[in-house]
């Protein structure tokens, strides 16, 4: 596809927005899904102060802004801010005219029907796109791994899902959702660092803690044993320099933080961990396809990027599954972007071209067309 009419692929995550052109092997633009508004009145005349900032600019000015995430738990909750993010994506990041390109958007599994309709409406009525499509995130991740059957454990910043897929179709009755993801782990790390005597409270400081989490945390293969090691020696301690030059030391917090994925009780939640949720999802499927799911368990999303997570999943699921079952956890190195990559693959397939919802179809049927064409 030539750049002129290439389809645009936008993966709107709770934490990061990934955007680019179909056919590319990686997104061109990756920026935080944040809209920031000034906390104080502007006093410098002629500074060209704006009433809102999006993405990296909001991130860099976070000290004077109140930051809001319009996507919570994978689902859009603030449409005005969401529109700002899309506007920023088209005009500032990709520098394209949306009325000239088909747009592929992604959505969380079990997204409310009204949400997909609203997305469709905004694309056609606000941005005048010639065509659009809404695809389920986990399905795209599976495409990116070169499979059509498997179970995807997709965990991002706002929500975690386990989605069994057979021959390209998601099995909705077996999809499970866990409202425990990266943002909760960041908040938990803030809490346990506060117990150490470091104070992180504002939205701006939360971003510092997110960086600590991404750079230093890992998943222990055996949590109790790791705790014992941490208690008896300083071999697991690492230091981190804060923006103001202060250096903090972090020890067992490094693996206590992501351990909450396997033991949600750490966060005071009564739900099952990601290993049990994956197992339960497989058990909701037909007995004949379970073998294929166990052997094709694909991890996707930024919250699966912790070192050690695949080995731990392998160990935990092996303990739950029948003893003779072959279990394979696939953790592609590019899994942070695998939803976007799958979208790029899908939107550039020749067989996909008849799947787009065209402006004409939208004008004839209205927003509900999305339920008939996107499944």
Curated annotation (Swiss-Prot):
Keywords: Acetylation, ATP-binding, Cytoplasm, Cytoskeleton, Hydrolase, Methylation, Nucleotide-binding, Oxidation. Belongs to the actin family. PROSITE patterns: ACTINS_1, ACTINS_2, ACTINS_ACT_LIKE. Actins are highly conserved proteins that are involved in various types of cell motility and are ubiquitously expressed in all eukaryotic cells. Signal peptide: none annotated. Its EC number is 3.6.4.-. It is an enzyme of class 3 (hydrolase). In vertebrates 3 main groups of actin isoforms, alpha, beta and gamma have been identified. The alpha actins are found in muscle tissues and are a major constituent of the contractile apparatus. The beta and gamma actins coexist in most cell types as components of the cytoskeleton and as mediators of internal cell motility. It is found in: Cytoplasm, Cytoskeleton. This is Actin, cytoplasmic 2. InterPro entries: Actin, Actin/actin-like_CS, Actin_CS, ATPase_NBD. The modification N-acetylmethionine is found at residue 1.
């Amino acid at each position: 596809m030539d750049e002129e009419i290439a389809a645009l692929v936008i993966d709107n995550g709770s934490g990061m927005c990934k955007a680019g052109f179909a056919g590319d092997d990686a997104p061109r633009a990756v920026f935080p899904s944040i809209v920031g508004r000034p906390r104080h009145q502007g006093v410098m005349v002629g500074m060209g102060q704006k009433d809102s900032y999006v993405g990296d600019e909001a991130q860099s000015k976070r000290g004077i802004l109140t930051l809001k995430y319009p996507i919570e738990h994978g689902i859009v909750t603030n449409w005005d801010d969401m529109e700002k993010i899309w506007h920023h994506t088209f005009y500032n990041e990709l520098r394209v005219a949306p009325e000239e390109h088909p747009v592929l958007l992604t959505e969380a599994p079990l997204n409310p029907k009204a949400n997909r309709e609203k997305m469709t409406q905004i694309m056609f009525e606000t941005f005048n796109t010639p065509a659009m499509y809404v695809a389920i995130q986990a399905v795209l991740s599976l495409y990116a791994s070169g499979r059509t059957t498997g179970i995807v454990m997709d965990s991002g910043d706002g929500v975690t899902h386990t989605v069994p897929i057979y021959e390209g179709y998601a099995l909705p009755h077996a999809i499970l959702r866990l409202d425990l993801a990266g943002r909760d782990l960041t908040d938990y790390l803030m809490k346990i660092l506060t117990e150490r005597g470091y104070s992180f409270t504002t939205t701006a400081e939360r971003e510092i803690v997110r960086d600590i989490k991404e750079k230093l945390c890992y998943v222990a293969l055996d949590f109790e044993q790791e705790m014992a090691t941490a208690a008896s020696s300083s071999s697991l301690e690492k230091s981190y320099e804060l923006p103001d030059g202060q250096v903090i030391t972090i020890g067992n917090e490094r693996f206590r933080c992501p351990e909450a994925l396997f033991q949600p009780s750490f966060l005071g939640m009564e739900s099952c961990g990601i290993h049990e949720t994956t197992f339960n999802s497989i058990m909701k499927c037909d007995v004949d396809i379970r073998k294929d799911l166990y052997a094709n368990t694909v991890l996707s999303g930024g919250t699966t990027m912790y070192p050690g997570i695949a080995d731990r999943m392998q160990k935990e699921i092996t303990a739950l599954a029948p003893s003779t079952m072959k279990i394979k956890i696939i953790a592609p190195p590019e899994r942070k972007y695998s939803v976007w990559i799958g979208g790029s693959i899908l939107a550039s397939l020749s067989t996909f071209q008849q799947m787009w919802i065209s402006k004409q179809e939208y004008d004839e049927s209205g927003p509900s067309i999305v339920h008939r064409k996107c499944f």
